């Protein structure tokens, strides 16, 4: 599996976002990581659907949409997803991880499983054939700027 570079937009300077995006494009990164939080699965709220639309309108870099939300399979229609996009879902965010992965695939996107630091890798056993990759979390989900675990 090829490793891909996906810097987090959440850590960008929002007052200089156009310049940040230009620098990302010049750096030829693989994709942009966009954290979506609902205040339920994680205690924080962040970037939402309008922000994703703005990004899509201003860059051709594929998006890596990290859904830190309850029941992510029911939220996919909120986003204008394209075949270049990756969508990461957490096993803990839904009682039916297979359905969540299938819903991402049905949108034509690549499905990623997000693996929290405290989640054993065996949690992915039953979906390894269905996913396109793994987002390995180096911090507990929910807040930027944490120390790596």
Q: What name fits each language-model region?
A:
Residues 3-16, 43, 62-70, 90, ...:
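Active-site mouth loops of central-metabolism enzymes
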Residues 45-66, 103-112:
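Alpha-helix-loop-beta-strand connector modules within alpha/beta enzyme cores
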Residues 40-43, 64, 71-76, 95-97:
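Short active-site-adjacent helix-start/loop capping segments
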Residues 13-16, 58, 74-75, 82-149:
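Conserved anion-binding
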Residues 32-49, 139-147:
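Glycine-rich, proline-tolerant flexible connector loops at the mouths of alpha/beta enzymes
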Residues 23-26, 64:
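Short, compositionally biased "basic patch" segments
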